Amino acid sequence: MKAVERKSDLNKRNSQDKNKHYSLNKTIKVDSGSGRLMTGITSAFLLYMLVIYPLALHDHYFDITYTKYTVFKVGVILFAVIWAMGLVIVLTGINAGGMKGRHAGGNVKVGTMDKLKAVICDGVYGTDICMVLFFISGVMSFIMAEDKKNAFTGAQGRYCGLAFMILIFIMYIIVSARVSNMEKMWSLISMVFVLVSSVTFIIAILQNIGFDPFKLLDGINRKQRNIYVSTFGNIDIFGSFICIALPLFMGLYVTEKSNIKRIVYGIGVFAGFMAFIPANADVVFAGVGATIIAVLFATVYMERVDRLFELVMLGSGGYLGMVLLRMLVGTNGAKITGFNRLAEHPALLVIIFAVVLFIRLIIQVYINRNKTEIYINENKSEVYINKQKNGTGIKLIIALAVVLISGIAVIIYGRKNNLAMFDFNDKWGSYRGYIWRRVTGLYGELPFVQKIFGHGNESIRSLMDDRFYDEMLQVTGTVYDNAHNEYLQYLVTQGLLGMLSYVGVVGTAVITGVKKIKKSPYILGLLLAVISYGVQAIFNVNQCITTPYMFLMTAMLIGMCRRATEE
């Protein structure tokens, strides 16, 4: 009787193991088939956003904001419809081979939940929660708004109304979902993005030295030509794009193993630094400066400091190459302002070079790569392994010290030489000092409910017109429709909930990316893009031209981290 019970138990275990085996097969087959379908749809959208969207123009710069918004809106809506259709195909069990209830390549019926998990993420990240809260804040801001039409369309500002919030929320949910083999597709798509971005950089470079091959500046007042560039319009917006593309290429350069692909990414880095001068926007130095600091820590942690040195050479070579090109060919008459005036201060350039050289020497002295020594005794019966410690903690502390010392040195030099960038007043940062002070005061005057949920989407223009219209024209000569600080912008328009949830989106995405940085070679580039945009957002405007890239890169980052966790 006992023997029979043992046999029964054995059969039961075999049956359970067999069921587990089939369950595993079901997951794999759903992931490999329906996953490919959804990956293809997502890849098509990424190509749309990274190839077509950057180059989209209609009437030169005259309607560029509306044109970009329309292209983005059409792309997201079309993508959402196709994605929903793909999801229906997956859930109904219909595949490319016309089979229903079974997946191509398998004989096992797959449940709806298994199919859904093959497409939608299996787990929630902090960024997902913050993104939901950010969307809710946009809805609440719309409810608080007096002008509902403007709050929905955002036409009074930069088309960042509730409609825009809906679009980025849909894009985030779909792009960050679980898809199979996204890493392989992203490798190809990112290289195409390098080429497209380089085209936009080259257009800006040519315009800066007096050539306008596509006649984009025709009809623009000569006094205003210096603030329009490339296929993005305003120099600050173009600078914002650089803060997305360049850090992405830098991260991919660090982690890429293929020499050919690394050369392509290197070209993107070189061209991106050349575009610093045509952009002529301090936001570029803020975003990319933060990126360089992040790359320093990342390369030390990942034991790839050689790539950091190569990036420094590529970056400095690109910037100096643009300076030389302007000297040889001439310019369009645009004056170099802000941090680009560093070229006029040789002593400060020497300090920067000395800091870079010091970092390199420190790295050379303290880097200890992982080394494993294997000893085998004579009769080969025992093996001894001696693994040396790499001292990563010490190197990170040294890197932090170098960053702090160099930062203090730059500030001291700037203050002693009375550089305008270090003197905060109403004129600071092209009157950002003025608008920040006024917007902060406006927030303090809002009712308590609006302090929490905001005065209304894209409502800065109406608030400033009501209180400071004459003063704005007298002091700055222009009318402001944005706080020129994304965090202050969301604080006033979407309240404390909107500002904190936006900070949460950026912060949790960065934390997640740091934790998973070694899980995928594509995480670092996306992480750097989010960091760079988050820093430049302190000095720039949220708008429908480059702000979508921030949420796209965040969605891609979370999607990659999600996939890395599952693997």
Named regions from a protein language model:
Residues 2-3, 9, 25-37, 41-56, ...:
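Alpha-helical transmembrane segments of multi-pass inner-membrane proteins
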Residues 48-61, 80-166, 199:
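N-terminal hydrophobic segments of proteins, predominantly signal-anchor/transmembrane helices
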Residues 61-67, 152-157, 235-236, 280-287, ...:
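Membrane-interface catalytic loops of GT-C/OST-like multi-pass glycosylation enzymes that act
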Residues 225, 436, 453-456, 480-488, ...:
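Alpha-helical membrane-protein architecture signal
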Residues 234, 431-479, 494-498:
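TM-adjacent membrane-interface loops and short helices in multi-pass inner/ER membrane proteins
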Residues 391-413:
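Internal/C-terminal transmembrane anchor helices
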